[in-house]
């Protein structure tokens, strides 16, 4: 996925979940939209280099959106609206070999208990429900999810277990939007219930896929699979 021209700045603070104050390279202070509702642990330190996109909509209250942050010497993608598109692109171009062979991909399809699946794949082999997660927290060389307690994420695991019981395929897809991770694990110290449900889901037939992205100011694309270590 190609990115638009990005604007560089320095993070002052992130607050109210969806706002951040940034100093641009010319010294101008701006308030920008933060498209991430998680804790952003490790990715929201004051003084970090950030890259912003500019909206073409003149009516937006905050025309700049925070896209990337430099964390531990590498760029990390914090925009949680991108992973679904990244995964779909990678499925369509054949990068995700485990999800080849489906004829159609539909986003945001209603299912379960008032839920929407990120991607529904359909083909001769049946249906595959893919729930996509954005991963930016890294400790050592291990990416961890979630970075905050996620009741919604717990619900998604229960929904995937249900579709597997009904005979369909269910996949939890961890999109690691940074290049310094070598594996993915549940963040048990942050959300032990999510870790418990993830292990239960995998024992129940849900599949876990994790792919690391190449992240640069010019593009973000999924490149290679990482092991999921429980």
From Swiss-Prot:
Name of the protein this chain belongs to: Sugar fermentation stimulation protein homolog
Pfam families on file: SfsA (PF03749), SfsA_N (PF17746)
Gene3D superfamilies xref list: 2.40.50.580, 3.40.1350.60
Domain of life: Bacteria
GO terms, molecular function: DNA binding
InterPro entries: SfsA (IPR005224), SfsA_C (IPR040452), SfsA_N (IPR041465)
Assigned protein family: Belongs to the SfsA family.
NCBIfam families the UniProt entry points to: sfsA
Lineage: Bacteria, Pseudomonadati, Thermodesulfobacteriota, Desulfuromonadia, Desulfuromonadales
Alphabetical list of CDD domains matching this protein: SfsA-like_bacterial
Species whose genome carries this gene: Pelobacter propionicus (strain DSM 2379 / NBRC 103807 / OttBd1)
Database matches in PANTHER family: SUGAR FERMENTATION STIMULATION PROTEIN A (PTHR30545:SF2)
């Amino acid at each position: 996925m190609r990115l638009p021209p990005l604007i560089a700045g320095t993070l002052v603070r992130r607050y109210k979940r969806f706002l951040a104050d940034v100093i641009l390279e010319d010294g101008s202070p701006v308030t920008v939209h933060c498209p991430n509702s998680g804790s952003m642990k490790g990715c929201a330190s004051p003084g970090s280099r950030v890259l912003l996109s500019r909206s073409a909509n003149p009516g937006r209250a905050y025309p700049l959106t925070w896209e990337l942050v430099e964390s531990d010497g590498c760029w990390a993608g914090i925009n949680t609206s991108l992973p679904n598109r990244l995964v779909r692109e990678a499925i369509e171009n054949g990068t995700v070999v485990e999800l080849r062979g489906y004829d159609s991909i539909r986003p945001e399809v209603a299912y379960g208990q008032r839920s929407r699946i990120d991607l529904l794949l359909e083909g001769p082999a049946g249906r595959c429900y893919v729930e996509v997660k954005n991963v930016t927290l890294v400790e050592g060389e291990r990416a961890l999810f979630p970075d905050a307690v996620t009741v919604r994420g717990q619900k998604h695991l229960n929904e995937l277990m249900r579709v597997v019981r009904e005979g369909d395929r269910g996949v939890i897809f961890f999109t690691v939007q940074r290049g310094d991770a070598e594996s993915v694990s549940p963040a048990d110290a942050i959300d032990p219930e999510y870790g418990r449900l993830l292990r239960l889901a995998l024992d129940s037939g849900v599949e876990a896929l994790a792919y690391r992205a190449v992240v640069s100011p010019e593009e973000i694309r999924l490149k290679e699979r990482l092991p999921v270590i429980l």
